Amino acid sequence: MVNIGILALQGDVAEHVRALEESGARAVLVRRSEELASVDGLVIPGGESTTMSNLLLSFGIFDSLAEQISNGMPVYGTCAGMIMLATTILDGRDDQRSFGAIDMVVRRNAFGRQVDSYEEELDIKGIEGKPFPAVFIRAPWVESVGESVDVLARAGNAHDGPIVAVRSGQALATSFHPEIGTDWRFHELFTRMVQRES
C-alpha cells in the first residue's frame, strides 16, 4: 500500500483522507518538511492559494516540497492546489509563490465568488464510465497550457471551454473538488500514478 500525503495546512483535509483511503492508499497528514520523507506522493488540497503559499513559507516546507516535486514525486492539486502547481498565476499577489510543476497559466477565482459556486457533470479524458460530478467553489481555470500538458476536461464539456483538469508527467490538477461526494475516480487515478512510481 502506498503512502500518500495530504498537505494539511488548510482545506478539505478530512475529505481527501477519506477519498484516498477509499482508493486503496494510506493517507498521511503532512505539516512539516521532515514528514515528506514518509510519503510516496502528495495531495495539495483547496483553500486560499495566497494563504497557502504564505503558510508553506512560514512552516519552512516550501523549498523541501519544491525539491521533491522537481525530483518527480507525484503530486495532485485541487482548486488552490492547482494554482500552487502552475508556472504562471493571474490575479495572484506579487509575493505569491508556486511550484511550477505544470506548464500552465492559471487564473485565480476565475469562476467568480462563493455565490457563483456550482456543480456540473464532466467528461474526463482517461476516466471511464459516467460523467464525473465536479464541484466548483471559487475555482480557478487554466487559460493556457504548454505542449507537455494533457488537457483532461473543460467546463461545459465544450471544445473551447475553460480548462479545468490537466496532467503533466507525475503532476495532476483539477480546478474542482473531487474529494466532495463519493466518486473516488480522480483519487483512484492519482493512487495508480503513485503506485507506478513507488
Predicted regions mapped to residue ranges:
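Cysteine-nucleophile active-site neighborhood
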Residues: 49-123
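Short coil/turn connectors at secondary-structure junctions
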Residues: 1, 39, 71-73, 96-97, ...
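N-terminal beta1-alpha1 cap of cysteine-dependent amidohydrolase-like domains
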Residues: 1-58, 62-70, 184-198
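Cofactor-binding loop segments of dinucleotide-utilizing enzymes, especially the Rossmann-like FAD-
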Residues: 9, 80, 176
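Short secondary-structure boundary/hinge segments and terminal tails
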Residues: 37-39, 86, 126
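Amide-donor transfer/coupling interface in amidating biosynthetic enzymes
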Residues: 108-198
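Redox-cofactor binding/interface segments in oxidoreductases and associated redox assembly factors
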Residues: 44, 77, 174
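Hydrophobic anchor at the start of a short beta-strand
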Residues: 27-28, 75, 171
